[in-house]
């Protein structure tokens, strides 16, 4: 009798362990999948005058990546694309602005106006995605 009871509880234990590991896997994925991240592009200029020129180009209808390639002093070859950035991986003012912006597209960007000042210089930021 006792061996049957043990094997019975053993099966139940295995079932619980399997479902337990599944839920722990979901928990492990939860923060990554639900973690706040934005797909960011920016134009970075050290000089305020240069960033204002870039802002005028954007307002005149130029695509964000083209303005970034022409004006940005960082990541210009990628059209200002910084890729996916998570909370805590950006400097304070940049992060606040990035998470406040709506998602937009290169030919009709919604960007920070006025530019955001950080220790790196002045940024015009746009967001292409959020997850």
Swiss-Prot record:
- Could you confirm whether the keyword Secreted appears in this record? no
Superkingdom in the source lineage: Eukaryota
Q: Where is this region: Disordered?
A: 1-37
Q: What enzyme class is recorded for this protein? A: isomerase
The record's keywords, sorted A to Z, are:
Cytoplasm, Cytoskeleton, DNA-binding, Isomerase, Nucleus, Phosphoprotein, Rotamase
Q: How does it assemble?
A: Found in pre-ribosomal ribonucleoprotein (pre-rRNP) complexes.
UniProt-recorded name of the protein: Peptidyl-prolyl cis-trans isomerase NIMA-interacting 4
Q: Native species of this protein?
A: Bos taurus (Bovine)
